[in-house]
Curated annotation (Swiss-Prot):
Oligomer of 12 light (L) chains and 12 heavy (H) chains; L and H chains are disulfide-linked. The functional molecule forms a roughly spherical shell with a diameter of 12 nm and contains a central cavity into which the insoluble ferric iron core is deposited. GO terms for cellular component: extracellular region; Golgi apparatus. Its main location: Golgi. GO terms for biological process: intracellular iron ion homeostasis; iron ion transport. The keyword Secreted applies. Residues 1-19 form the signal peptide. Keywords: Disulfide bond, Glycoprotein, Golgi apparatus, Iron, Iron storage, Metal-binding, Secreted, Signal. This is Ferritin light chain. It is found in: Golgi apparatus; Secreted. Residues 50-208 form the Ferritin-like diiron domain. The keyword Calcium does not apply. It comes from Trichoplusia ni (Cabbage looper).
Amino acid sequence: MKMLILAVSCLLAITGSLAADTCYNDVALDCGITSNSLALPRCNAVYGEYGSHGNVATELQAYAKLHLERSYDYLLSAAYFNNYQTNRAGFSKLFKKLSDEAWSKTIDIIKHVTKRGDKMNFDQHSTMKTERKNYTAENHELEALAKALDTQKELAERAFYIHREATRNSQHLHDPEIAQYLEEEFIEDHAEKIRTLAGHTSDLKKFITANNGHDLSLALYVFDEYLQKTV
C-alpha cells in the first residue's frame, strides 16, 4: 500500500511540473529508486542563490544576533534608570521602548531567515569591521542618550552593509528581496529613531548648559518628566 501511495505521489509531482529544475530532479530521482520515503533535499524555500554565494544569509543571521544583544543592552539601561537611586522613570521608559523594539526586530529577522529556507545560527558573526566598545549601562543621562544614538547608528550602518551586499548586481550576489525587506522594515525606521535620539541629546544638552549648569538637577528632572509624557 505504501509503495502504491509513493508511486501515485511521484506521478502527480512529475506530471504537475512545468520545467525540469532542482526540486523536480529530486522528485524524479527518488521516484526512480525503490524506497519508502521521499528525501527531496532541494524542495525547500531557498532560491536566488541565497546562502550559496556571498554573505547575505550569514549577515542577516548576524544582524538578528546584533538586535538581540542591543535589546539586552537597552534593557540594562532601563533597569538602571528605574532603580531607587537614579529614579528616572522617563529615561527608563525610553530605554524599555528601545529594548522592546530591538527584541521585536530580532524575532522578525529570524522569521525572515526561515522564510528564505534557512536556519537561524546565533554563532554567526558579521564581516563588517566595527570599533564598538563594551556597553555600559550605568551612565549619566546625557551619556546614556549618546550611547543610544550610537547604537541606533550602528544598527543602521549594518543594514546599509547588508543592503549593499544584496544589491551588488552580480550573477550570484544580487538579492532584491532582501534589499526590499531591509528598506521597508529597517532603513526608514532607523532614520526616524536616529533623528529622535539626536533631538533628545541636543535638547538635554541645552537644558544642562542653561544658566551655566547651575540648575542641573532641575534640568534633568524636567527633561525626565518630558520623556515620561512623550515616549
